């Protein structure tokens, strides 16, 4: 059985590349096809606060023009739509204690793999500042990312999302030469309690 592939055309071609339109492909194991959500363009995950926001503030700016919100700012909108989001494959539960270190994780018994794992705190230098009360975790990504020769992939959390309860460690991966899945390390920055 063949791998499941999700492909998107890329809009830019590096100098000297072939005239064929470059594509990014997300490939998962066949047994996961239909059991996990597919990667999608980032704009599909625009935050609710942004969707609710009016373009105009209902008042004039210093020049007598309509006062505009960040929704009228093309650089912000472009950043929200830049790239792709790989959704968490399964529902998870976190129990975050006051110490923010001994985090308990849970998910359904029938999932084919653990969607989250812990890193050793020493990998980020914890408990030294700024990680005095931190447990590094990682999102387990079931999708391999394929790009044409000469392309690399920036892995980061969605841009302009102060509402998210986690902060990812960003990384740049040469996916044109790296033929395996890439996990995403992060810190829980949300409140303590059950989530």
Features from the language model and the residues they span:
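Non-catalytic terminal segments and appended small domains
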Residues: 1-178, 189-195
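Short strand-edge motifs at loop-to-beta-strand transitions and within beta-strands
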Residues: 182-186
């Amino acid at each position: 059985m063949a791998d499941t592939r999700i492909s998107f055309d890329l809009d830019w071609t590096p100098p000297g590349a072939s005239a064929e339109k470059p594509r990014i492909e997300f490939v998962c194991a066949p047994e996961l096809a239909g059991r996990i959500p597919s990667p999608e363009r980032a704009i599909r995950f625009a935050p609710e606060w942004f969707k609710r926001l009016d373009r105009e503030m209902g008042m004039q700016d210093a020049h007598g023009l309509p006062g505009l919100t960040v929704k009228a700012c093309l650089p912000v909108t472009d950043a929200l739509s830049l790239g792709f989001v790989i959704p968490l494959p399964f529902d998870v539960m976190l129990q975050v204690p006051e110490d923010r270190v001994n985090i308990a994780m849970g998910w359904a018994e029938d999932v084919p793999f653990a969607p989250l794992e812990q890193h050793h705190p020493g990998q980020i230098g914890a408990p030294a500042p700024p990680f005095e009360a931190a447990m590094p975790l990682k999102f387990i990504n079931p999708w391999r990312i394929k790009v044409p020769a000469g392309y690399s992939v920036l892995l980061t959390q969605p841009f302009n999302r102060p509402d998210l309860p986690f902060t990812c460690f960003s990384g740049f991966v040469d996916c044109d030469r790296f033929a395996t899945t890439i996990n995403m390390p992060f810190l829980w920055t949300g409140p303590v309690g059950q989530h």
